[in-house]
């Protein structure tokens, strides 16, 4: 796994050992960032269920202003910190060791892009979306990765689907805040 483009292009990223995480493939990641490439520059990013932190790191490499990485796995947090050190992005990053619900209930910041890639088939996208409205900017985008058997609804908690993509058994849904695709 690597950073695809930007200031950290080609840097290798480590991933947590074991079956607890399922890193986004380079192909899927590249497709996601091609779809949102004009919405990254200067934005504040939240990488929820961050795993290796690769989505937030890719956004930073492409010009995002800052990123917060939230995960409650010690293995994941070690990888995120190592990846941030390797890419020299620590100064524009925050790594938070807490459950996503607790984090979302306490923060006052507003995010412009939120990456959601939780464990599949547990309803966590909807649980997170229910708490994200108040901590996101008016032009926020949610980028949700799920299995194709558990695609979130077209509208959820003030976010409307903008685009959907399918890559084998992976589905990516991009939502915009308060905006339908019509």
Label each residue range with its predicted role.
Residues 1-182:
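Class I S-adenosyl-L-methionine-dependent methyltransferase catalytic core
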């Amino acid at each position: 796994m690597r950073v695809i483009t930007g200031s950290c292009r080609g840097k290798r990223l480590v991933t947590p050992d074991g079956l607890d995480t399922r890193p986004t493939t380079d192909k899927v990641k590249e497709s996601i960032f091609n779809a949102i490439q004009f919405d990254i520059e200067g934005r504040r990013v939240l990488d929820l269920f961050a795993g290796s932190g690769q989505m937030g790191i890719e956004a930073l490499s492409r010009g995002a202003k800052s990123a917060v990485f939230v995960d409650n796995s010690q293995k994941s947090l070690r990888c995120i910190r190592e990846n941030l050190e390797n890419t020299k992005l620590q100064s524009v990053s925050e790594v938070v060791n807490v459950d996503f619900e607790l984090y979302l209930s306490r923060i006052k910041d507003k995010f412009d892009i939120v990456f959601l890639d939780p464990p599949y088939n547990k309803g966590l996208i909807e649980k997170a979306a229910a708490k994200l409205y108040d901590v996101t900017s008016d032009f926020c985008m949610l980028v949700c990765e799920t299995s194709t058997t558990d695609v979130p609804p077209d509208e959820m908690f003030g976010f409307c689907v903008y685009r959907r993509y399918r890559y084998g058994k992976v589905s990516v849904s991009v939502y915009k805040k308060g905006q339908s695709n019509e």
